[in-house]
Amino acid sequence: FASYVIKNDVKATTMKSGIEYMVWLSEWYRANSSGKGVGFFQIGGGIAGDFPICVVPMMYQDLEWHDVPFWSYFCQISDSTTSYGSYSGAVPNEKITWGKLDIHTPKYIVESDATIVAPLIFAWILGW
């Protein structure tokens, strides 16, 4: 992307920064998390996969907005196992200690290849 900006093929503002996305996500979450709430469906793991879930602790801990509800559920598809000790293989309960999920948040993990499982889940949800 940077090379295209340097060549003046695209503007740097074509793509939002991580900060811009987090600000947008916080506004979206505040507008949509009332009532039944908003669930979190994560494909994969690690730092990149965990980025958007951090909007809740940012609002609750950093901004001190104590009326922010936790995610209403958490589901992750991951092929990384806990025994390897990687961040991608961390179980959903670890997210409780960081304020990303509540102890009562329903948590699910599907240990499989996301390229196989995600399309099956999406097809079921869409009624295909």
Please provide the spans of the model-predicted regions:
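Active-site rim loops that border cofactor/substrate pockets in soluble metabolic enzymes
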Residues: 1-43, 48
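Extended aliphatic helical segments
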Residues: 5, 10, 23, 38, ...
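C-terminal functional extensions of proteins
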Residues: 47, 54, 61-128
